[in-house]
Amino acid sequence: EGFNILRRIGRCLPQGYFVFTSNVDGQFQKAGFDSARISECHGSIHHLQCLSTCCDSIWPADDFLPEVDTEKCLLRSEFPRCPYCGNLARPNILMFGDWGWLDGRSDQQQQNLDDWLRRVERLLVIEIGAGSRIPTVRRLGESLPGQMIRINPTEPELGRNKGVSIASGGLEALRRIEAALNELAAEPGAAETCR
């Protein structure tokens, strides 16, 4: 439901939306967000790269269908292999101290985000659940011009004059934001808005 609310809000904005996420699970794509408007700064579990980095290739993990013994937490199926050298493949995600991560896909996504940001006249960042332990998302939102809505139940603090902080879970806050936008849209003389 939260993803749907975000998509509805994004579709109503003059320049649309762009997602910047440190999540590697592909949930924005699964929820129907345009993959050309997503930047996954730590990579994606749905893409693979060669473990020995024989090349700079990153490929979709669509053909890897893991069969897992959930009781023993063991992979039953074959490990994925590099289509170029036959060595083991790994998820294209950035781990701590990971000098072998190939960042080409994430760099291209970041370039797409940068291009979009240059075209946006009035930026609004909606940050949901980003914490200070791995502050990549927080730092980006704070560094950008424009206003921000920070939604975080435990770390909602936001710099002065930067925007609004909401000490709440993501779904609850998004429901309240959407309800407020709908109320504004229903007022006499309100600008035409999408629903």
Give residue spans per PLM region:
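Conserved catalytic alpha/beta core of Sir2/sirtuin-type deacylases, generalized to analogous enzyme cores
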Residues: 1-195
